[in-house]
């Protein structure tokens, strides 16, 4: 029988799985407030380079990492003695990474995911991938064991967090005490980072994943020079699509009006440095999928997520014309102007 753990005020010893931009900036934030923090990376050479330079030049350039931040490639050492694990691995690589690490994960240690995406092969959310790989979903105690899982999501551009610019996020878990402890761990004595709590882990993860597809569409609008009116319409109707599917999948409607829904969508669609929007801008400017991907340093989660969302929309019978249009532009080579025209000429209806 799974033992329920009630959490105290803050976590003290944290390992971050993933050495990308978000993993690095969260390591910076935690070290600045005195939390013992280490980062594990899949690529030993890349991790050693980050440790040597005290800078993640590939994913978070221009920001020196604290000398207190540790780096560990050894699987067992990275996960020994920790009281919280942060999963910061791109969605399509999560299963591979956690299959490697699972034998070193203590059954009492909670895991918070900062990954945004939906797995292509299974259509699972990040917390569901963790539950499946770590064995949470193999018996009737699934719901109880899910109380070890949480999600931290919201409009959190890594470069801005590194510069201590004001930002907000949401800590979501079925276990409210875990959500609150994560909230205090990341927010207490950090005046530029405010974390709220939520128990709608389904809505928080779906909103964080699907907004990346709409961000690609926003970039396409920018690249094609379609104007601000078109972009405003895109964000509004894009959020409506996200909400429709989310509700069908069990999310709470109000989640999509909050930080992880509207908030994250706006930031991702307007930020000049956002990967998904910038990728879309290249597509709108005439590049094909492969060209735009090769020009982008980091993983563009919205590309893979687009495939997953189209499949989910079909499964749940939800109309998602913008997402479908993005899919056709990316994978069927549909010309951007024709895609825009087809969206504008859809059957007229009430809002």
Where are the language model's segments positioned?
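Acidic, Ala/Val/Gly-enriched low-complexity intrinsically disordered segments
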Residues: 5-8, 140-142
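Rossmann-like NAD(P)(H) cofactor-binding subdomain of soluble oxidoreductases
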Residues: 65, 71, 75-80, 84-166, ...
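Internal alpha-helical scaffold of NAD(P)-dependent oxidoreductase catalytic cores
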Residues: 93, 104, 129, 136, ...
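NAD(P)+-binding Rossmann beta1-loop-alpha1 motif at the extreme N-terminus of oxidoreductases
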Residues: 10-63, 70-73, 100
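NAD(P)-dependent Rossmann-like dehydrogenase/reductase catalytic/cofactor-binding core
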Residues: 218-222, 247-257, 261-351
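Alpha-helix C-terminal capping/helix-to-coil transition sites in glycosyltransferase folds
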Residues: 80-81, 210, 262
């Amino acid at each position: 029988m799974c033992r329920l753990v009630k959490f105290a005020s803050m976590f003290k010893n944290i390992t971050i799985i993933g050495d990308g931009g978000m993993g690095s900036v969260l390591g910076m934030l935690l070290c600045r407030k005195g939390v013992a923090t280490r980062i594990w990376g899949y690529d030993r050479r890349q991790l050693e380079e980050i440790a040597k330079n005290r800078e993640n030049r590939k994913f978070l350039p221009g920001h020196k990492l604290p000398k207190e931040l540790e780096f560990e490639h050894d699987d067992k050492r990275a996960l020994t003695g920790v009281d919280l694990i942060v999963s910061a691995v791109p969605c399509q690589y999560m299963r591979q990474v956690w299959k490697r690490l699972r034998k070193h994960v203590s059954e009492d240690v909670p895991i918070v995911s900062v990954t945004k995406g939906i797995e292509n092969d299974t259509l699972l959310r990040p917390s569901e991938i963790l539950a499946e790989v770590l064995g949470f979903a193999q018996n009737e105690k699934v719901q109880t064991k899910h109380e070890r899982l949480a999600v931290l999501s919201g409009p959190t551009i890594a470069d801005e967090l590194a510069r201590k610019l004001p930002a907000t996020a949401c800590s979501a878990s079925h276990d409210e005490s875990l959500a609150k402890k994560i909230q205090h761990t990341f927010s207490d004595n950090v005046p530029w980072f405010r974390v709220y709590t939520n128990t709608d882990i389904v809505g928080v993860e779906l909103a964080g994943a699907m907004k990346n597809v709409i961000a690609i569409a926003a970039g396409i609008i920018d690249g094609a020079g379609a104007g601000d009116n078109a972009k405003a319409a895109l964000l509004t109707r894009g959020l409506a699509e996200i909400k429709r599917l989310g509700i069908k999948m069990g999310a709470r409607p109000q989640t999509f009006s909050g930080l992880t829904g509207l908030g994250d969508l706006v930031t991702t669609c307007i930020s000049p440095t956002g990967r998904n929007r910038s990728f879309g801008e290249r597509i709108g400017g005439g590049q094909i999928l492969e060209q735009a991907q090769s020009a982008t340093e980091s993983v563009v989660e919205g590309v893979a997520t687009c495939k997953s969302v189209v499949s989910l929309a079909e499964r749940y019978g939800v109309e998602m014309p913008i997402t479908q249009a993005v899919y056709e532009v990316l994978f069927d080579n549909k010309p951007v102007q024709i895609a825009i025209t087809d969206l504008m000429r859809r059957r007229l209806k009430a809002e």
